[in-house]
Amino acid sequence: LAAVDCSEYPKPACTMEYRPLCGSDNKTYDNKCNFCNAVVESNGTLTLSHFGKC
């Protein structure tokens, strides 16, 4: 099972770095920062489906 450590998040701003992750909501997030901010917003209901685009 793929996992991402989001303990340092949320962050006020994310870089434009493109390292896509696919969330359990079937949405592609541009990078870990964008994904982790969404995880925090979802109160932990959002999880990582896999690395790479959905």
UniProtKB/Swiss-Prot annotation:
* Stretches assigned to the Kazal-like domain: 4-54
- Please give the coiled-coil regions recorded for this protein: none
- Recall the GO molecular function terms of this protein's record: serine-type endopeptidase inhibitor activity
Record's PROSITE patterns? KAZAL_1, KAZAL_2
CDD domains, per the entry: KAZAL_FS (cd00104)
Q: Which InterPro entries match?
A: Bifunctional_prot_inhibitor (IPR051597), Kazal_dom (IPR002350), Kazal_dom_sf (IPR036058), Prot_inh_Kazal-m (IPR001239)
Q: Name any one Pfam family assigned in the record.
A: Kazal_1
Q: What is this protein called?
A: Ovomucoid
